[in-house]
Amino acid sequence: MSDSENDYSDESSGSEYESPVKKGKSAPKKPAAAGSKKKASATRKPAAKKATTTTTSTTKKSTTSKKSESDNDDFSGDDKSSSSDNENVFKNIASSAKKGKSIEEIYQKKELLDQILLRPDTYIGSTERQEEELWVWEDKRMVHRKVSFVPGIYKIFDEILVNAADNKQREGNMKFIKVVIDREKGFISVTNDGAGIPIQVHSEHKIYIPELIFGNLLTSSHYDDSEKRLTGGRNGFGAKLANIFSTKFIVECADSKSKKLYKQTFTNNMRSKEDPKITSYQNKTDYTKITFYPELDRFGMVEFDDDLVALLSKRVYDIAGCNPTLKVSLNDEELGIRSFEKYINLYFPDEENAPKVYYEKVSDRWELAVTLSKESQFNQVSFVNSICTVKGGTHVTHALSNIVTAIQEQVNKKNKGSADIKPAFIKNHLSVFVNCLIENPHFDSQTKETLTSKISSFGSRCEPSEKFIKRVLDSKSGIVASILEFAQFKDQSALKRSTSSGGKKGKVSIPKLDDANLAGGTKSEDCTLILTEGDSAKSLATAGISVVGKDHYGAFPLKGKLLNVRDQSTKVINNDEINNIVTILGLKYGKVYETLSDLRYGHLMIMTDQDHDGSHIKGLIINMVHHFWPTLLRMPGFLVEFITPIVKVFKNNQKPISFYTMPEFLKWRETNDKGWDVKYYKGLGTSTPGEGKEYFSDLERHKIDFEWDEGANDNIELAFSKSRADDRKKWMAEHIEGTFLEQFGVKKLTYSDFINKELVLFSIADCERSIPNIVDGLKTSHRKTLYSCFKRNLKKEIKVAQLIGYVSEHSAYHHGEASLYSTIVGMAQEFVGSNNINLLNPAGSYGTRIAGGKDCSSARYIHTRLNDIARAVYHADDDPILSCVVDDGKKVQPKFYIPVIPMILVNGCVGIGTGWSSTIPNYNPRDLIQNMRLAIDGKPLKPIKPWYRGFLGSIEANQGSKVQGGQYLSKGIWKKLSDNRFEITELPIGFWTQDYRELLDELETPGTRKKKKEEKEKKAASRKGTKAKPTTTKRSKRVDDDDDNEKVTEATVKSYTNYSSESTIHFIIDTIQPVDEINIEKVFKLVSTINETNMVVFDEEGRIQRFATTTALQEHFFPLRIKHYQMRKDFLSERLSEEYSRLSNKARFILAVVNKELVISNVKKVDLINKLKEMKFDRIINKNSNKSARDKIKKKKNAFDEEDAAISSDEEKDGAQEEQDDDTKGYDYLLSLPLWSLTLERVKKLIEERDSKKKEWDILLSTPIQEIYKRDLDALEKALDDQDAYDESLKNQTESLKKRTKTKALPRAKKISAKVVKDTKEAPLTKLVKPTVKIPTTTDSNVSGSKRKKSDDTTSTSTSTTTSSNTKPIESFFAKEDKKPTPAVKKSTLVSLDSDSDFDDDVVVSSKPKAPPKKTSKVIELSDESDQESDQESDQGSDPESPPKRSKAPPKKPTTIATKKATTSKSKVIDDKSSDDEVIKAPTNRPTRSRVPPPKSLSFLDSDSDDDDLYDNEESSSDSD
């Protein structure tokens, strides 16, 4: 039995239209009932306080319960609580039966009208008085206050009012709505001049149409769901409900077409009706007027009270605001509202602190306004087809989706340190007004408080303009600021809770912490915690602590750099590093410390490397303490740093000199360079434990106390606050090069000095690593890599792993292999969107556009070399004129290379440094070549636009962009194939194939990305051993809740097919809607933006500059390039002049020696030098060291290649050189000539070379630098032609291979036989038996035939005992290989070995003997403990623990090999004299033995191994032991 069956038990009889309530009551009882209802509502006041303007909580269950208490007295008996909806129905039936009620009296059927009157909640809401916070019309404005009203009477009025408004949608010429609320007479009338109701008799129902629609239930003109309507009516109740709950209901209709006026009166809750009065009507205007007298007694009312009138008046103003073209009047007073925006202003009239309201008419069907909510809770006033949806619905969610998303992005951008702000959190700070027209709307009930229609059925979309969204996001709105402020408040509260149990403790257990013995005790203030940079530094600190004692000193290693905690509250809570420090020190968030007695340590000592990164770590620790506990920094002696040398110099037995800063060392070296050995201490790990003990033994000289100063507060914020990025730019620009801190022996250091003299050096170095140079377009890591490749003359391919080591060694690279690996790979990549000119050659898998290069192979698998075009870009003749950087005491890469064209525009860049970031697109090198030629000729440069090698799409200027600077649109390529199908053959720049597949999956199945993200988080959490944070709540989703995937709420893609390769794009997509109805470029993201607004670079002087246009950048580059061409010409001229003099002097010298004018034998060195001076031979000191190196290369070229020669010459230059005095150095080129060159033939050759050099010199002097530049541009253009030809050849190769390939798919796998299926089913999966491998051995050839037969039989027996039925498929496969197997190998898994055989590394090789074995083969199963156990075991003798030696008899037939399939051990066949059938298992703890190599005639390669493993095995076969 259901509750509904019990609802009719209070009525036993009566007329069909007699009111059930009137029958059972007497007149005096009604006021008492009303009074009791008021008292009941008063008891629910606390619940009413929870109501807001957006949620009119009708408390249906409560009202239903009370209704049953008042109306069901006959049913319920004395026990009033038994009538509750939650009581057992059967108890009520039993109670009624005891009172003598019959079954017919208990189970009743009601007519619909009686049921509506008896149970009105479903149709009009509660008929009991209740109190709620609502908007009402009062004092000529909208007021939000507590209202006492009856929802039912409010609803019947709303039905009539909305019906009048619906006429506006049916009849566009409708002009007015007139509403009269007569409090004295107790009636309400609503009049509109819309299209009149036809005054004629309905042919089916035989009554007039007005009577049909106003006097009969379930009648409506809205039952055709195929018709698109923008009205509020739907179910056929509407105005009839007002008739039913009225004592009198008058319908008056004027129809100008039939010229009739219709008037009819209904009474007694629509049960009684008068005959319609039809008169003549001559006016041209139709109208409909409804007048009704609500049955006040039924609603517990005596009259229209003030609250009800205020609430009904508000609804009249709603209609006026939603229909601004209508003249709406209330009690004959026109309201004068001509727009929805003006209506919204009624909510904020003349308030000083009124929030700014942002309004936009999105379309003819959507109007939207947003403002800040003062109550920090979501408020909404919304209308659907003039219906006031007090609880919102899907229309509010949809209208706000784009706005909430934009606010979310903005807030998360400014609040990066905290958890992502959810849409529901943002909505709590908004007040929104929505007025919309929805096709055929669906509501949660007849009360129409909530819209439930799907967004796809709205018939229109609400997409606010970007201008409107920007206004909402503007700081003046206060919305973003309010959300940020509240989010930060929550974060601070969470921080305080995270350390609520912290404070001073005895012992703490944290991994890697070496706690001081007295930490956390009474003497904790005397204890010092040493924070070190890594584990190796902690080892050094531990060694030092052994000197000063462990009672007062503890050590804890940091994992790299600490988090910048400013604006990072949520990340701080989840940061293990910071939490550990807080726990170790005993700190509490939010506590203001005035003494150190509450902490576990009274001092915090920072011990980091003395390099730039070490300075940064110090600064981050200072920043953390300053942000959370600033008073600690003011306490002298709390924060301390420990300094160690960065450089030490040694000389003979003198005491080493230590330097604690690089500028300090460089200054010393200017005057003390000779005879000193230099050792660089780049990290604390360079120091030995002994040196660590020395440092701590002199602790007072190695520690520096930080001291608070007046500017400390501002300087710390300057260095670490995100809001002061512009100030940091100025801070770095004002730094004077060469400024450094005097550290050793200094007792105190102010925070301002640390920030401005030490930390600033890190910020500058960070920018140098991250931002490229305008001259060569390279960052420091790229430049070091290119320098090393040029130095090595890298024309042969080497592994990237090898190159990483070479770069680290020869260019003093200090930042780890992973960083250098990404640099090298990035310089070699050539897929679309990477490099226009790749300077390194990608030999191997360097990544593709499938994953944007992330799918590259490991450094040990890929090779590289210098690309041929590299030297066309960076000409070798420019190398000698470049100034080099000194690092680790040696010259390394130049400050910048000087390319032929501005490479900064060729390959572009993306980089983020301290205070600066840079983003430069790629451009066509041919455009740059053309512009350089124009600049040479003195002509203006042509504008260029971004260009990407291999990109097939278009790049166009964004004409509508308001961004300062250039902006371009990168567009992919798509083509319509049919009405619901199109293909994509190119993606915009920066969109990779895998990313695009994920987008298509999302468009096909919305929510896919979210599910993948959740799965990823769960996996990450499982690896960490923690629970993944839920991304969704378990509560039921409300219709006004935001969806995380609002942007993709419905499927757009039906299916798609991917034909893309590693270099091409090809998707064929089938859509649900026709292609023409979809904005393909927007929905499928086929357009991306490319900006020229952040082109930041270092100039040639090391200053950071921002360029507004590419033209300005080229104009800056060109004069610099011309200057260096002049420098190149001067250098080459000087070198040719030197060569000319050298050759001339050599010829004179040899002639003088040959003619005996100069005697060089048995002459003192001093006399010889004086003689050379007397003969006026030129002193030539070799300034151009590169020249001698090249000469050596040329001499050695025949012996080995250029790369080896370059390395060799470099080693010779770096080797020890003989010290010479100045006089000898000048004539060394003469005195070092070999004796065999002192001939006349040599003189002749030297004179020819001299004349050739003179000619070359003259040509150089006569060639203008502009001509030299043009030659280089021609050479580069030729190299680009070769690059284009290479790209074209790759395309042609793919096409030709496609045509050549005949097989499109592999042949299908063949079905297995029924016998195999049966055997497989019979063999239990848990007892897999490995195939037995037999190695037949040879014995004496004179063995008798009987013995041979016996041996064969024994072998067969042995085989059968060790071979399972599940090896039959293997046997059948191998049977094809050995057509004539010998008895010794019968039923074994032996495979013929020929030249084409491929097999695994774990094999047993055996040779078939000339004669059968003398002894029976025995099977031994060896443990697979090591793969190194091999055939050598057969040489160990006949002992069971040592297999017999392999027969040396040469094989008569091809050797066979036994493969090991899915087994964990190896099987060997040996001879055994004691037993023919015994199977022996060798012990698993047998010592590993080296593998015996196979016979030379059986050399083979494992098909599954790669070459590297092969070479490694060959080179280190002995290592297997």
Swiss-Prot record:
What segments bear the compositional bias annotation Basic and acidic residues?
1468-1480
- Residue positions binding Mg(2+) 1: E533, D609
Q: Name a biological process GO annotation.
A: resolution of meiotic recombination intermediates
Give residue spans, biased composition: Basic residues: 36-48, 1021-1037
Q: Which cofactor does it need?
A: Mg(2+); Mn(2+); Ca(2+)
Q: What is its EC number?
A: 5.6.2.2
Q: What does this protein do?
A: Control of topological states of DNA by transient breakage and subsequent rejoining of DNA strands. Topoisomerase II makes double-strand breaks.
Q: Where is the composition biased (Low complexity)?
A: 49-62, 1354-1368, 1454-1467
- In this chain, the site described as Important for DNA bending is at I912
What is the predominant subcellular site recorded for this chain? nucleus
Q: Which SMART domains does the record associate with it? A: TOP2c (SM00433), TOP4c (SM00434)
> Where does the entry annotate site (Interaction with DNA)?
K561, N564, R728, K729, K779, Y813, S819, W992
Named from the GO MF annotations, one term is:
metal ion binding
Oligomeric and partner information: Homodimer.
The active site lies at Y861
List site positions: Transition state stabilizer: R860
- Provide GO CC annotations from the record: chromosome; nucleus
Q: Where is this region: Interaction with DNA?
A: 412-414, 1085-1094
Q: Which UniProt keywords apply?
A: ATP-binding, DNA-binding, Isomerase, Magnesium, Metal-binding, Nucleotide-binding, Nucleus, Topoisomerase
Q: Which organism is it from?
A: Dictyostelium discoideum
Q: Where does the chain bind Mg(2+) 2?
A: D609, D611
What name goes with this protein?
A: Probable DNA topoisomerase 2
